[in-house]
Amino acid sequence: MQSSWPYLVIGKRSQWGTYGILDNVYNCFKYLAHLKHDWKYYQYMSGSDLPLRTNLEMVRIMKALNGSINSDIEEYEMDRYRTMEGIHPPVPLFKSAMSVSMPRAAANYIVRSQKVKRLLRYLSHTWIPDESFWTSVAGNAPYTPKLVLVTGSICLVLRVPGSYRARDIIWLRKHMNMNPPWEKTTSSVGTTYIGRYQVWEWQKVCGVLDVPDIITRPELIVHKLSLSVEPAAFMCILKEIRYRSHNPIEFDATSYSEMPTVELYSGKRITELTHPEWLLQSSFYRG
């Protein structure tokens, strides 16, 4: 198969919750980072994902991201440490979805970072490490470009291009007296994570009744859909995206440039954010 498609990378067989998933994904990510092709953004998709945006729309959105990393942000769960409990990780850990939008500059840094290699080794002994990697890498930016926090012999930051401070966002969620927005559309994104739309009810497979809501969402892809469970939902969404690809609509990505992580990366302070309330929910919110 690889002789027919030279860019096809085949990983090892892996099981849910184990390091094998992260290992396979990271090896593909590293392969792409070392290519001479001048790609601009990496976007993860699984076999049960479907795009919600056309190529034209994705390009405009990724231009609006302006070099920032887009990953989900949630507190790390203590039961995931397993045998590593009590052993300091190379950087503070955060929980995130596997789906991430990563600029090329960040990819180039990550695959050459010794600290990232140490993080991968650490996570290989933890539970569901694929949901602990991206924001642990992207969410440990220093306060300023010249400041590095050190505790003992442990450096607590990563200078990844496009990164942000996840701990500040988690703190705001706990202390900000605001209501999260109900509207989440391409004209008013309403969230700070667009990597993937997913309903967290025991990994719910989306069906026909979900389609009207899914079509209006601002995310790049939807998870999960299956041709073995209400296949009409899969085909309806696919047909809609194909139609828009051949008949482009007026698409303005301005709202994506107003996402909090994009504005924080561009230099705005927390108090200067256009939509601070967009920080209040992660994709793990059930609602």
PLM-predicted stretches and their roles:
Residues 1-287:
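ER/Golgi luminal nucleotide-sugar-dependent glycosyltransferases, focusing on the catalytic module
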